[in-house]
């Protein structure tokens, strides 16, 4: 069988392999493109809890408070490491199993004076606020304030019915945007002073990508067959806000703050999103996906999302042979030590080397967020940010779409 640069057939993980692993999430591979590398700043990281009070409960009816635990990365002059806590998700007959891993952020380090542009980072179902540390830390090191939430009832340790994530993921993101505009109530003053006043970027994986698109104006399809994905019959009542695309005046007012979306294997194009409603999305949008994605779908899932985003400047980057796991950190050492295939496969792809995939996700995300600044980056292998080198042309494909002439530009 011929070898493919950046791609590999994985053998089952060896329990002894973890002993030799020294790389941390976000450390670039030797073949990383230029924008995949860390930036000039050190990174601080802190944890904060906020509450979105009195929210509709699509599971039990009534109202409840949604407590969001936030991990916040920011530019600092400190360099250090910190221990993050996560868990492997539960499976039938097996409870979630906690583990720890190390990141290159200095815990509670003093921030560098801002203001800094803001990136919201949204995990999938299930996921966690530290699932994409490989992306959060380098973005902060390049001068961005990165905020990732544990979305209630959607995490490895707090996994609830899918209908709750369908209803609340866009609402959580709109709430975070409103919280930012309110001055980060509950945050330390030094942290509250960091966000700039520009448009926000939302980077979301799977259900995080779904949430970003719906927060920016898309709607749920009333003809969707959500029963096929485990949503109870009678879901249209509990999901009325995402069917209407209306969440109340305060949340809806935050929609215009979204200037850029990076959707990583976004879910819903095949199963849930009203494709015609994507014309309402005005945010610049980058879609990153594998053409072997069996969860979100490719030709019948993410490609239709790209084609219906007529109101937005957009790009579609396809990793050929990649499945759904385009966004997570590499499998943690705890998965190698346990030898549990399910724990390993929650993070890994069957074909792509996870560090090479991480490199490409970071590179294209930075290229899209930084625009002209990133376009100037070059190396012998990458003459420009969007020029795929010959060695990867069989593995990568890039499409570009322009907004309709009547659509406003958000820069």
Segments from the language model and where they lie:
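Short alpha-helix in the alpha/beta-hydrolase fold that links the catalytic acid
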Residues: 274, 297-307
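Acidic catalytic loop of the alpha/beta-hydrolase fold
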Residues: 269-270, 292-296, 324-325
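Alpha/beta-hydrolase active-site loop
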Residues: 163-197, 224-233, 247
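Short glycine-enriched nucleophile-adjacent loop
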Residues: 178-181, 209-221
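Short substrate-entry loop that stabilizes the transition state in hydrolases
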Residues: 107-116, 121, 125-158, 294-298
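Alpha/beta-hydrolase-fold serine-hydrolase catalytic core, especially in secreted/extracellular enzymes
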Residues: 10, 15, 23-24, 30, ...
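Domain-level recognition of soluble alpha/beta enzyme cores
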Residues: 15-119
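Short beta-strand/loop motif that positions the catalytic acidic residue
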Residues: 281, 287-289
């Amino acid at each position: 069988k011929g070898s493919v640069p950046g791609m590999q057939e994985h053998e089952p993980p060896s329990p002894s392999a973890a002993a030799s692993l020294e790389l941390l999430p976000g450390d670039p591979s030797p073949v990383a493109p230029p924008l995949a590398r860390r930036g000039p700043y050190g990174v601080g990281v802190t944890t904060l809890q906020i509450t979105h009070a009195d929210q509709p409960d699509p599971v039990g009816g009534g109202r409840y408070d949604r407590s969001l635990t936030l991990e916040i990365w920011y530019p600092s002059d400190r360099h250090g490491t910190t221990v993050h806590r996560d868990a492997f998700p539960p499976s039938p007959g097996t409870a979630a199993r906690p583990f720890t891993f190390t990141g290159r952020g200095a815990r509670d380090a003093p921030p560098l004076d801002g203001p800094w542009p803001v990136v919201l980072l949204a995990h999938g179902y299930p996921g966690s606020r530290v699932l994409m540390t490989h992306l959060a830390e380098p973005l902060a090191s390049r001068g961005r304030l990165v905020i990732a939430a544990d979305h209630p009832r959607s995490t490895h340790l707090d996994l609830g019915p899918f209908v709750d994530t369908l209803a609340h993921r866009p609402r959580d993101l709109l709430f975070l945007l409103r919280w930012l505009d309110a001055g980060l109530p509950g945050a330390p003053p030094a942290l509250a002073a960091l966000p700039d006043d520009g448009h926000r970027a939302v980077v979301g994986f799977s259900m995080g990508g779904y949430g970003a698109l719906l927060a920016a104006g898309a709607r749920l399809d009333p003809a969707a067959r959500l029963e096929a994905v485990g949503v109870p019959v009678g879901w249209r009542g509990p999901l009325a806000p995402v069917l209407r695309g209306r969440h109340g005046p305060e949340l809806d007012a935050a929609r215009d703050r979204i200037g850029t979306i990076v959707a990583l294997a976004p879910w819903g194009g095949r199963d849930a999103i009203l494709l015609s409603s994507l014309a309402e999305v005005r945010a610049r949008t980058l879609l990153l996906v594998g053409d072997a994605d069996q969860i979100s779908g490719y030709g019948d899932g993410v490609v239709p999302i790209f084609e219906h985003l007529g109101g937005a400047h957009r790009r579609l980057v396809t990793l050929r042979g990649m499945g759904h796991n385009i966004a997570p950190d590499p499998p943690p050492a705890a998965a190698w030590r346990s030898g549990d295939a399910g724990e390993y496969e929650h993070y890994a792809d069957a074909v792509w080397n996870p560090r090479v995939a991480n490199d490409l996700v970071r590179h294209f995300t930075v290229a899209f967020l930084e625009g002209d600044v990133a376009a100037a980056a070059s190396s012998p292998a990458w003459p420009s940010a969007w020029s795929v080198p010959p060695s990867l042309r069989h593995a990568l494909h890039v499409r570009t779409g322009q907004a309709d002439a009547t659509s406003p530009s958000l820069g």
